[in-house]
Amino acid sequence: MLGRKRLTGVMGLLLRNGEVRTDIELTDLYIDCGFTSRAEALELVAPGDFVTYSYAVDELENDCIAGRGLDNRLGAYTVLHALLRAREKGAKVGVFAATTTGEETTMRGAFHAAGRVRPTLAVAVDVIHTSDFSGMPPQRFGRIKLGGGPALAKGSVCSAPLNRALEEAAGRLGIPLQYAVTPGVMGTDADKLNQTGVGLPVTTLFIPLRYMHSPSEVGSLADVEQTVEVLAEFLAALDEHFDPDPFRD
């Protein structure tokens, strides 16, 4: 809790033996910080103070990590390091990167970033649900697994030349790609980027993630590293002759 000072608390909700509740109201939830009185609480917190889950990241086995906000801290990390590595590889074109606000709601951040930069093409880097744990059927999000490498979006919005260039980059590195079928929309900032200007060629490179949108998301550092490598190789290979227009493909 971010009040007059940082406070640690736990969410309080008492369930009876075997009880499962689906009608939880906002008034049923509270945060227990250990205060002994209302007066003591009001000395340190006020209505409207922000609350967030603990931002610590825990290391798991097999190069996995767990924490909140890996969607999309992993994407931001990947883009930053891919740009640094692309420069080391001798990238020949100008590359802009943006971490954006509102991806889950209005996608306003991506829209304004593209309006300012006016790029030739765009690749979003985001996370995608996996289907490799109990209770998650592959029919829901596809056969995506942790540790299986980056997943490339395949759908009507995705630029075929962009996808092919990313596949070729992965092939040169010997990195296997998974595929995420994204009919209609990708569910990433690429959807809004595609609608900017006169229409922007886009695609998305996904990082597999378990338990998305929970306080304990799980990702693979190996997947992150491979996504960095593929994106950097793709960027380093771009030149002024690359044409992302599928109608001239």
Positions of PLM-derived features:
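N-terminal hydrophobic/helix-forming segments and targeting peptides
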Residues: 1-249
